[in-house]
């Protein structure tokens, strides 16, 4: 059955459209792409402490922003030290989040670190791929950018497209992304492009065009992030030939014009990598946080949450589950993430709920992905099981 007709029930299931090996061979990933994540982390000394103060009202909510990594393939290249390594309304979440003046965060890029907080950028100064010399300025800019390009919560209200349809589409996109062996950044950027487009054009997008929007969003993201890009024919094949090449090109132009050719929104994975360095986490803890982040991509209730906040909350949940005997949110993590533990709690609880329902959810692409050896089988760990999560909820 064509994917276009299935969109009445939403998108095709991943298992129905597996890309054959001859197409996979055309979607190679250059060793440089894999090396991009190599040695992302090195062990740093334990980070300790800071808390910012100045609060400001944002919109009508008192919203918690203070101051201020691979996947299918690159998880195998992460090196830590010597070891290789769906939904209450989103508005309810946003109301519980307080924002700190971004200028306070900017000032930190030149500030002296508080006593006990390790300078992770100095430690990694010889790692050219980490751009340690410019890291504070880079992340200050990304924090400003995520506020500028923030997606509105509940943006599909009044549209034919629903949050459930969006979730099914993203579940399918995860499957296609995995089959093409694309970089993790490509998936997160694809979802960001999808949301930003639907935020503006959701009322003009029909069900039978939704999958086209999703696959073209991934095509655009691939052109930015990948070295070897799947062809349009390969993307068309992934939709069971529900669309043709001209439709793909027309939609690509429409999306780019709608977004005013601005594709510079930061993604949560970028922040997670920095926070993982600051928290001195191991590869399993980092992989669990990525699993939680990818589950949250499908949750319409979290679309209005800043990427940095999503990353911090996902890492908090991971540490809560895998390292319960140590302080979950260290002063160093608070300093480099810019979020206190209290600020994270609304999103943390939401993410724990996502983990609890993951096993019984009909949308299984993310869970199946993280049940594989390449991802350390974190989805199968007892800590990710509902029974264990229920016990840990009392500490969240």
Predicted regions and their residues:
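Acidic, serine/threonine-rich low-complexity regulatory regions at protein termini
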Residues: 1-215, 219-396
């Amino acid at each position: 059955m064509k994917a276009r007709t299935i969109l009445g029930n939403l998108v095709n299931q991943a298992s129905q459209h597996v890309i054959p090996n001859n197409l996979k061979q055309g979607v190679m990933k250059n060793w440089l792409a894999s090396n991009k994540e190599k040695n992302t982390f090195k062990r740093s000394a334990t980070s300790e402490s800071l808390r910012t103060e100045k609060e400001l009202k944002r919109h009508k909510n008192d919203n918690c922003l203070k101051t201020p990594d691979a996947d299918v393939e690159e998880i195998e290249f992460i090196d830590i030290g010597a070891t290789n390594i769906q939904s209450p309304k989103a508005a309810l979440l946003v109301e519980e989040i307080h924002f700190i003046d971004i200028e306070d965060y900017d000032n930190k890029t030149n500030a002296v670190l508080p006593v006990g907080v390790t300078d992770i950028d100095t430690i990694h100064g010889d790692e050219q791929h980490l751009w340690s010399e410019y890291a504070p300025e880079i992340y200050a800019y990304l924090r400003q950018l995520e506020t500028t390009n923030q997606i509105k919560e509940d943006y599909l209200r009044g549209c034919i497209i629903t949050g459930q349809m969006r979730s099914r589409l993203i579940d399918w996109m995860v499957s296609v992304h995995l089959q093409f062996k694309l970089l993790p950044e490509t998936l997160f950027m694809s979802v960001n492009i999808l949301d930003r487009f639907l935020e503006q054009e959701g009322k003009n997008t029909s069900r039978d065009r939704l999958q086209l929007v999703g696959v073209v969003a991934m095509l655009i993201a691939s052109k930015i992030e990948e070295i070897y890009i799947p062809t349009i024919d390969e993307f068309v094949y992934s939709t069971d030939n529900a669309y043709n090449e001209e439709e793909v090109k027309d939609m690509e132009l429409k999306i780019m014009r709608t977004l005013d050719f601005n594709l510079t929104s930061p993604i949560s994975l970028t922040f997670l990598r920095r926070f993982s360095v600051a928290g001195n986490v191991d590869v399993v803890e980092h992989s669990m946080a990525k699993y939680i982040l990818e589950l949250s991509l499908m949750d319409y209730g979290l679309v209005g949450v800043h990427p940095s906040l999503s990353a911090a909350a996902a890492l908090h949940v991971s540490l809560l589950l895998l390292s319960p005997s140590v302080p979950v949110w260290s002063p160093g993590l608070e300093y480099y993430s810019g979020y206190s533990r209290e600020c994270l709690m609304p999103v943390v609880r939401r993410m724990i709920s996502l983990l609890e329902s993951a096993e019984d959810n009909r949308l299984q692409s993310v869970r199946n992905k993280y049940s594989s050896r390449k991802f350390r089988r974190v989805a199968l760990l007892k800590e990710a099981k509902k029974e264990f999560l229920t016990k840990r909820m009392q500490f969240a």
